[in-house]
Design a protein with these regions (language model features):
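N-terminal hydrophobic/helix-forming segments and targeting peptides
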Residues: 1-439
Length: 439
């Protein structure tokens, strides 16, 4: 593979490995933005913005929005929206269960539509947010237990002879991870307290998710595929961030937006159904002395890329995809269409992204679900219910979506980063006669 792909995907693998969930995604993105000279804003304070300024704001520690103010009066917003959550098991409170006075297992629940069997028989750990009582103040501390801590063991075939005929796994009875012997009871709480630098009694509440400890890597005879956890949607997050940091602001405001809870419907204060994006765009408008009419004009001259990975043709199940629109790893950015509006792409936004990709020399692929399969939806159509702007759903073709270990193409990371860079530097205008311009 070309060196550019190799270097970029080495960075992607490192990003995947240090990003076990949405809290760490935002933490890691903040660090990159700060290193690039961005200033952090707070939602609970007034914003003072300047031409040429670079800023970011977060919500709940699990969603983030970054933007750059152009030197001149801006035309609209170029919004790249993606999500940083992935299907996983979430640890319940009072999680420890002692079995036969011999084992300690943990009580967990599903987060999102996961492939359950992929969580069996592999090293797991836990990461997330811990709320601690420190001198009467609640402090949120991020914890990642970076060791092979637990496993969900399969039932041996000798005890389940029908295993290879298909097993229906029950999340409550079959998927509880083994963390230690009975002698280790209360050990997880002590481990978390040590990681937080507090006593176990100071831990008030937690939001902790299991994750696969297997590091991301590249595979294939030519190392043409990247494999790892949470490629959906961290591959789009990573590529979008690279394009955002490399872009020069044009006539519109480039906006890099990372949302949470897409895998469970986006209906949270930090999800696409909330007002996070809308609030930020309105505050940018107000902080620069523009009125409501200016804001509405800007929305009419805006475009959003809703970036979320797509299904590649599976080599063992080629009949699961559309008859004439097939997508493959390493063959370009995917543009998604849906007659039922599960995806936001229409003829206008689809044409605009085609012009943009041609200008950036980035190949595109088209995706439709089979006509007899419902398929999934993305954050795009949810976001546009809050901010009504032209939008196109894109992504990268991947295999094993919602597995704990997924697979995609190494070239596509670079393709999307290049497209994102061109997108952030561009501007879209709609004329009175109904024609559109890409600047």
């Amino acid at each position: 593979m070309e060196m550019a792909y190799t270097e970029l995907n080495a960075k992607l693998c490192a990003f995947l490995d240090k990003t076990p969930n949405s809290f760490f995604a935002v933490k890691n993105i903040k660090e990159e933005l700060a290193a690039a000279g961005f200033t952090e804003l707070q939602e609970n304070s007034r914003w003072q913005l300047q031409a040429g300024g670079k800023y970011y704001v977060s919500r709940n520690g699990s969603a983030l929005l970054a933007f750059v103010i152009p030197q001149k009066a801006y035309l609209g917003f170029q919004v790249y929206a993606c999500h940083c959550d992935s299907p996983a098991f979430k640890l319940k409170n009072n999680a420890e269960i002692v079995v036969d006075k011999k084992y300690v297992k943990l009580n967990v629940e599903k987060y999102g539509g996961m492939l359950l069997n992929t969580w069996l028989d592999r090293p797991l750990s836990v990461a997330g947010r811990v709320l601690c009582n420190v001198d009467g103040r609640l402090e949120a501390r991020l914890v990642n237990v970076e060791q092979d801590l637990m496993m969900i063991p399969n039932l041996a075939i000798h005890m389940n002879r029908e295993a290879n005929d298909g097993v229906k796994l029950n999340a409550q009875t079959d998927m509880l991870p083994l963390i230690g012997s009975a002698a280790t009871k209360d050990g997880l709480q002590k481990l978390l307290a040590e990681a937080c630098g507090v006593t176990a009694e100071q831990i008030v509440d937690t939001e902790l998710f299991l994750y696969n400890r297997m590091p991301a890597t590249t595979v294939g005879l030519e190392q043409e595929y990247v494999a790892g956890g949470r490629l959906d949607d961290l591959q789009c997050v990573f590529a979008g961030l690279q394009g955002f940091l490399a872009a020069e602001a044009g006539e519109s405001v480039p906006v890099f937006c990372v949302l949470d809870n897409e895998e469970v419907g986006s209906g949270t204060k930090q999800g696409a159904a909330a007002t996070f994006l809308k609030d930020a765009l309105q505050r940018i408008n107000m902080a620069l002395g523009r009125d409501e009419e200016d804001y509405l004009v800007s929305l009419a001259n805006s475009l959003m890329l809703s970036a979320d990975n797509a299904h590649a043709v599976h080599p063992n199940h080629t009949d699961k995809n559309d008859l004439t629109n097939k997508t493959y790893p390493n063959e370009g950015v995917v543009v998604k269409y849906s007659a039922n509006q599960k995806y936001t792409t229409d003829a206008v936004s689809g044409a605009l992204v085609q012009l943009l990709a041609k200008k950036a020399n980035v190949p595109l692929q088209l995706f439709y679900n089979r006509s007899d399969m419902a398929g999934g939806s993305t954050l795009g159509n949810i976001s546009t219910s809050q901010v009504a702007i032209k939008s196109v759903d894109i992504g990268l073709a991947q295999l094993a979506m919602h597995s704990t270990y997924e697979m995609a193409g190494v070239k596509d990371t670079a393709y999307l980063a290049k497209l994102a860079q061109a997108f952030f530097a561009a501007a879209v205008a709609e004329a009175a006669d109904g024609t559109y311009f890409l600047k």
